Amino acid sequence: KISKDLISGSVEVLKKHNIKKFSIIYSPGIFEIPYIISKNISSFDAFIALGCVIKGKTPHFNFISKAATDGIMHLTVANKKPIGNGIITCLNKKQAQKRSDPKKKNKGGEAAKAVLSVLGFFKNDRK
């Protein structure tokens, strides 16, 4: 539900800004997202990475979150393509639900807005 809500928030922003051609590529986990983006980097102008990591009782949360973020940043800089980071890192499920709520401040939508901003889709909105 959390990932689906992040996707919904992102898709809503894309459609609102008349982006009609986009693909949704699913990943088995957060750690695999940079690899999946790297395999598809030449096929798209930009990417929006979405997902959720909820902290457990081991340091695994920290390693996975950092690895995914570092991988995404490396791909962004190395390929000169924007990748919006909508991977939310939360302390519990309630926090994750709040940050992915489509009726509130959905982090998937925010990641989509960031990518569109970098691509220049908001030029007219700033006047």
Regions found by a protein language model. Give the residues of each.
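Short, acidic/small-residue loops that bind anionic groups at enzyme active sites
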Residues: 62-89
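Glycine-rich phosphate-binding loop
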Residues: 35-72
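N-terminal beta-loop-helix "entrance" segment that forms/cooperates
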Residues: 23-39
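Phosphate-binding/catalytic loops
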Residues: 91-106
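Glycine-rich phosphate/diphosphate-binding loop of Rossmann-like nucleotide-binding domains
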Residues: 1-28
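A charged, well-structured terminal subsegment
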Residues: 105-127
